[in-house]
A protein has these predicted regions:
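Low-complexity, Ser/Thr/Pro/Gly-enriched N-terminal "stalk/linker" regions
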Residues: 18-73, 99, 103, 107-128, ...
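Fungal secretory targeting signals
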Residues: 1-20
């Protein structure tokens, strides 16, 4: 044997050992991730005592940060993983799915700071709830419009399995009403701005729009199979047309129609593409699949942005054809702006998805948009179409192998920074040794690992795409939704009382660390209990106008009494206004809006010495 051939044999042996080690890690960690995700689901989850049945808790962490809530988005994505695992053969998971849709039927009816179910449906845009399913009154980025779409997708996937197994009546009578509410919300509000999946940017989000499109397409398919009408689903082409406008010529800008100034390079887009992945979709499908040329170009630009060792020291010295630790966006400062497990793992899933689609189609198309992505991994690549061939040494198979190895390298990054016990927090430190930080045992992190491992093993969710023709011109359509409590699924029979949005504005000069709350005589204002009152926002506070504000949905036509309350720092307690205020909420069915223009009346406090 020559020295050269001997070296090649040695390198091949090392590569096989590394691959086997990664295989063992994925197998072991996948089992840990699934169990850990289930441990965060009520009522029996070992990490979330007190959570209601079917409630998916974001994390057991109750401080620094407090994630002991249920987010509609996180819950839907987690349960989509659970539904997929169930369909793939784990029948023990059905009880979690049944509990989930019962809990969501109830949550849909909970009046909250975003609104109520009746008659406008605005309450469906609320981001999070307490773990018993009750409303969260704190200041937050509201509304968030991805939740209803993602929940609909999850329940539609389960519904198709039920229909295939002879339970169409259950779907039509019990589950469809939940889905119909969410689809109505999507159809009515898809073209309205809201907060993105990171809960920071108010505008139009790529991730949200992509999920909304999928929900309407799948909703239409399910409605047809049930013989029911989905009026909102008719808007799918308009949503799809709008999705194309996020492309800026180089990459997808994650958020548009926003005042927030960022580059727009954001993991939002990668996560969006894997959430709409369909192995049967073509790579030029306008739903923007992982194998789409623009998706691949966007992937390279985002990943390259995080190769900066000054930004992420853990990525120092990693070559261009290897995976790196990824965060949300390069301007991130939350908890120091670190890599996220679910995003780094999501990058691997994205690549496994693309490889699966190329294999399904038997070809790989390389154009001027995607060529830089391929060139990093396979330098001899040229523009054109690479066809599947019997010769294993051809370019088609070589590209598949290199992209698969690239995907594995992102998994290897996660392997390096996941503790030996398999626990997965939200983030890991951008500086060596890359220790876990932020919320512990993040449910979404675990769900992301399971879905990645499914794709790596060649296990794929059911197909959903249909042929949708892009309109010649994008239009800003909307259809007013019809909302009905899903009583057969366990929802309370809430009736016709409507709610009307009221903007509370008060000028109150405060010191750093002091907050202002709104309390009043109705449940939406805490029924005079400041602990359940509305925390106000100082986002528009200036020295010239010390404005605190909050938007609240109140019962239409009622007289409401309210006051403002200062919450002092250093456990100094509360200071109440010395005046009682009243207002009359506009009647139901009117287009009249109401905003107060108040000024604080009463004593003020001073900062404590803590």
């Amino acid at each position: 044997m020559s020295l050269r051939s001997g070296l090649f044999s040695l390198f091949g042996l090392v590569a096989n050992v590394v691959a086997a080690d990664l295989d063992d890690f994925v197998t072991r960690q996948r089992d840990i991730a699934l169990v850990s995700a289930l441990n965060n689901i009520g009522p029996h989850g070992s990490m979330v005592q007190g959570a209601g049945a079917g409630i998916v808790v974001a994390s057991p962490s109750k401080s620094d940060p407090d994630y002991f809530y249920t987010w509609t988005r996180d819950a839907a994505l987690t349960m989509k993983m659970v539904v997929d695992e169930f369909i793939l053969g784990n029948k023990d998971l059905q009880v979690y799915i049944e509990d989930y849709y019962h809990s969501q039927a109830i949550i849909q009816t909970v009046t909250n700071p975003s609104g109520s179910l009746l008659a406008s449906g605005r309450g469906l845009g609320e981001a999070k709830y307490l773990v018993d399913g009750s409303r969260f009154n704190g200041a937050w980025g509201r509304p968030q419009r991805d939740g209803p779409a993602l929940r609909a997708i999850t329940l539609i996937t389960y519904s198709h399995w039920l229909i295939q197994n002879g339970q169409e009546s259950k779907v039509k009578d019990v589950i469809w009403p939940i889905i119909a509410n969410d689809l109505s919300y999507v159809g009515q509000y898809w073209n309205s701005t809201g907060f993105d999946l990171w809960e920071e940017v108010s505008g139009s989000s790529f991730f949200t729009t992509q999920s909304q499109y999928r929900s309407l397409v799948e909703g239409n398919t399910l409605a047809q199979s049930l013989g029911v009408k989905c009026t909102a689903c008719e808007l799918a082409p308009d949503v799809l047309c709008f999705l194309q406008t996020f492309w800026n010529g180089e990459y997808f800008t994650a958020n548009i129609n926003t005042q927030t100034q960022r580059s727009g390079k954001d993991a939002n887009v990668i996560l969006g593409s894997i959430s709409v992945f369909d192995i049967a979709a073509s790579c030029d499908d306008p739903s923007i699949q992982p194998c789409h040329s623009k998706s691949l170009a966007n992937f390279k630009i985002l990943v390259d942005a995080f190769r900066n060792a000054t930004l992420y020291p853990v990525n120092d010295g990693i070559p261009i054809n290897k995976g790196v630790a990824l965060g949300r966006y390069t301007e991130d400062v939350y908890f120091g702006g670190n890599p996220w497990y679910l995003i780094t793992i999501g990058a691997a899933e994205f690549l496994y998805d693309a490889v699966a689609q190329w294999k399904s189609q038997g070809q790989i198309k390389v154009d001027s948009t995607s060529q830089p992505f391929f060139a990093d991994l396979y330098p001899k690549v040229k523009g054109g179409t690479y066809q599947k061939a019997a010769n294993l040494s051809d370019d088609y198979n070589s590209i598949l192998s290199t992209v698969t190895a690239y995907a594995d390298s992102f998994v290897a990054v996660a392997q390096q920074y996941i503790p030996k016990n398999g626990s997965m927090s939200e983030q890991f430190n951008k500086a060596p040794p890359g220790n876990p930080i932020s919320a512990s045992d993040l449910t979404w992190s675990y769900a992301a690992f399971v879905t990645m491992s499914e794709r790596r093993a060649g296990l794929y969710p059911p197909s959903w795409t249909t042929s949708t023709k892009l309109p010649a011109t994008c239009i800003t359509s909307s259809k007013t939704g019809t909302y009905v409590p899903a009583i057969a699924a366990g929802a309370p029979n809430v009736t016709g009382s409507c709610s009307v949005p009221v903007s509370f504005l008060v000028n109150a000069t405060t010191y750093y660390g002091e907050n202002v709350y709104l309390v009043g005589n109705v449940a939406e204002l805490g029924s005079w209990n400041v602990g359940n009152g509305q925390q106000m926002s100082a986002s528009n506070y200036t020295s010239k106008r010390p404005l605190w504000n909050v938007d609240v949905e109140l019962p239409g036509g009622q007289n409401v009494s309210y006051v403002y309350v200062r919450k002092q720092n250093c456990d100094q307690g509360y200071i109440y206004e010395t005046t009682n205020r009243t207002l009359t909420v506009p009647a139901c069915g009117t287009t009249q809006s109401l905003a107060t223009n108040d000024a604080w009346e009463g004593p003020t406090g001073s900062s404590g010495s803590c």
